[in-house]
Amino acid sequence: CVDWMQGESDEDWSGLREGMYESRMRQYQRQITSDIIARTGQNEPPIIAITQLGYVNDGHTAFTGQYARLSATKLHNHGQFRCVNTLYQYDFISDGLHLTCAGQNRRGAAVARAIIQEWFTSGWYGMVPTGFVWNSPTQIQINVPAYTNLVLDTTTINTSGLANYGFSYTDETGAPPAISSIAISSDGKGVLINLASAPTGRFGRVSYATVENALQSGATVKPSGRTLGARGCVRSSAGITWAYDTSVTLYDWLPAFRINVF
C-alpha cells in the first residue's frame, strides 16, 4: 500500500487546471506500481490510499479551485486509487497545514482500517458520493455509500460560520435559490438538499466541505480542520475505537466534493 497525502503546494499553484492533478496521479500510479512490483516480486499492484487534503488556498471558494484537494473523490475506485480518509474532522496546528500529533495518529488508524477492509474483507468503498436524483423540483438527493447510516454531527464539527452543514448550491444565474434545509434520507444512505425555490438557471452544482471561515483577527493564514476550516458535518453512524483512548470513536467522514446536478 502507498499512503498518499500531498498537494498543498499544488493547491497554491495558479497554473493548476481541472483534471491536471488527476492526470499526474495516473502517471504516478503506473510508475510506482512498476517500481514496487520490480522490487518485491508481488503479484498484485499496490493500493494507493489517498487522504484528502484539509488545506484550502485562501483565494479559492466553494466552486473555484481546490483541484488537487478534490481529485481524491474523482480518482476514488479508478485503478488502484482509494479515497480512504479526509482531514477536516481533525485538529491542526497554527500553521493551518499540519495535523496535531493526535490528529496524525487518528489519520493513520483510518488508513489502516481501510486497507484491512480492502485486502481482507469485501473491499473498501468509502463514502464518496455515487450520484444524485431530483426527488422534486426543489429537493436534490446525493447518494452516499456507507457501511452504516449517515448522520449530521454538530458536536465534532463547529457550525459557527458554517452554512448548511457544509453544503453549497449554485447555477448559471448568479442568483441561485438558497438552500433551505439539509437532512439525511429515511434509509440513511443519502443527503437531502432542500432548495427555497425551484432553480431557473442551468448548470446546477452542489459542493460540500469547500468553504472556510473568514480569516480570524490577528491570524496570518486561514485555518484548516473541524473548527474553522473547509469542513462539513456528514459522517457514518458507527466507527472504530481509537487504541490510544477507548472513549474516542473514529468515524468515516464524507469527503469534500463538487457534483453537477443538471
What is the predicted function of each stretch?
Residues 1-262:
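Cell-envelope and extracellular/periplasmic
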